[in-house]
Amino acid sequence: MSGVQGASVGIDLGTTYSCVGVWQNDRVEIIANDQGNRTTPSYVAFTDSERLIGDAAKNQVAMNPANTVFDAKRLIGRKFNDPATQADIKHWPFKVTPGAGDKPQITVEFKGETKTFQPEEISSMVLIKMKEVAEAFIGTAVNNAVITVPAYFNDSQRQATKDAGAIAGLNVLRIINEPTRAAIAYGLDKKGGERNVLIFDLGGGTFDVSLLTIEEGIFEVKATAGDTHLGGEDFDNRLVDHFTAEFKRKHRKDMTQNQRALRRLRTACERAKRTLSSSAQAYIEIDSLFDGIDFNSTITRARFEDMCGDYFRKTMEPVEKVLRDSKLSKSQVHEVVLVGGSTRIPKVQQLLSDFFNGKEPCKSINPDEAVAFGATVQAAILSGNDSSEKLQDLLLLDVTPLSLGLETAGGVMTTLIQRNTTVPTKKSQTFSTYADNQPGVLIQVFEGERSMTRDNNLLGKFSLDGIPPMPRGVPQIDVTFDIDANGILNVSAVEKSTGKENKITITNDKGRLTKDDIERMVQEAEKYKSEDEANNVRIEAKNGLENYAYNLRNTLNDEKLQGKIDESDKKVIDDKVTDIINWLDHNQSAEKEEFEAKQKELEGIANPIMQKMYAAAGGAPGGMPGGMPDMGGAGAPPPASHAQGPKIEEVD
């Protein structure tokens, strides 16, 4: 491998679900998690005793809504006062507050304490889970990953995602665009002439459209557009609003302040939405939803389509935009490829088909796994795994989604790099001073498409000082914009006569974690991981004691042993088992050592009696239906004189 240590994976870090893959046996393997699912919910839950990630977190969300965090991708790299963040907060049961620099932070109760997390930390926990899923499958440590982001993510959102990878202990080989990777899943094995392919990627929280040209293993992105705040979650929100209004109308009760009821309703709405992709009608039945009232209702596909019609129509705007930007007509698009779970909605497919004059969208790739598939191929290439014939001639040419430039006199946006420029790229332009004898210039870097910088997004700024006194317009200042393969920008400025230089990597410190923050979060992630492991060991000890106690009781009550054990001995063990079970009921959160001590205590009483019983029975004829209880290593085999009975091995 070319300087990359350990295994490399591709991770699709989704708003609602995440997916991981590895390149093995000359193909992509999408890896199932411990529940057997190939996608894992991007959920993290905090309880009194443990942290849960993935399916386990999502499964308990109705019981613990305030401390179960999801949709972190909708917060990452955004400001607290961003209108999109404010709109989301209304629908989230967990608490989001403004932190330093107007960054959103998530507050939860964990092990009896109030804890605050950055969105990057929550995303890093999901990444750690995906890393563990991959490690369980591969059998070795996973150190490197290619992580995907929506093509329309801006600079700060990309940086924040990269930080999340670092906190998870991953070497992030590349941050890449989702639709481009999905195109690989579509085109990896396709041979033949040049094809124009439109990738329509509508997921749980984000929406992207990219237009690519694919020819003999070369994937060139021509244009990209999208909405980083549109997806299945928004359709769920409409359904939740509809049913809360219906509940209020029918029962004269407002359930909008009850987070548990809202969460149960949301889960039912998500299920109904999926049902409507294959049926004309879906039923909602929730027992004792609010104030003991059972809620039953129906929703038709037509009503759902009407309810979300504006969202569905909105998805066509970026399609028109990429066609304009790439200067192609509808008829020049050879294939429309669907990616993301929300593209299963029939209305979305119909709108697309109508837009392309009846052309049926391609459904040959799995919309949930396509992005992870492409990320895995990229990880294999970047980690030097290009001995594979399939990967040798593969070339990916991606683009920057937004125009980049700087502010010139009067607040005008002067663009150096146009949107949809292939990356990596480098552009330079010469500027000068605005006033006579001006000693320095302030270089302010913006991204966006508007003509005035006030309407665009400020990425960063720096000064170039020490310019010798000269009339306005005489000094020559060369400004260079350089975008790397991750889509992250470096800007430098040089004054030609003096050679004075200053530069900035747009790390977007306003929205970004400092190196110290990342270091601290890496250490905290390690601490949480070791706490999780310690908790698992504790639970194993508890389960071991519980199993031992119940097995012992089952053995005592076994018909085949009736009359072979003294009633007094039986009572001694039975009383002790009852004591232990009562103790367990009241000490669920005891330490591992306490469970082990109780097990030894029980073994100390039970083992001599059980040995005496088995010795008297001459071995253990016929095998006990209840099974020999685990003696925890304390039981000795029966004496040799009774060797005529079948041998019993100790159960580990």
UniProtKB/Swiss-Prot annotation:
Inducing factors: Constitutively expressed, but whose rate of synthesis is augmented by nutritional stress such as nutrient starvation or excess of organic nitrogen.
GO molecular function annotation: ATP binding; ATP-dependent protein folding chaperone
Region feature (Disordered): 618-652
Keyword Signal: no
InterPro entries recorded: ATPase_NBD (IPR043129), Heat_shock_70_CS (IPR018181), HSP70_C_sf (IPR029048), HSP70_peptide-bd_sf (IPR029047), Hsp_70_fam (IPR013126)
Keyword Methyltransferase set for record: no
Compositionally biased residues, Gly residues: 619-635
UniProt keyword annotations, A-Z: ATP-binding, Chaperone, Nucleotide-binding
Record-linked Pfam families: HSP70
Residues in coiled coil: none
UniProt record similarity statement: Belongs to the heat shock protein 70 family.
This protein's name: Heat shock 70 kDa protein
Lineage, opening ranks: Eukaryota, Sar, Stramenopiles, Oomycota, Saprolegniales
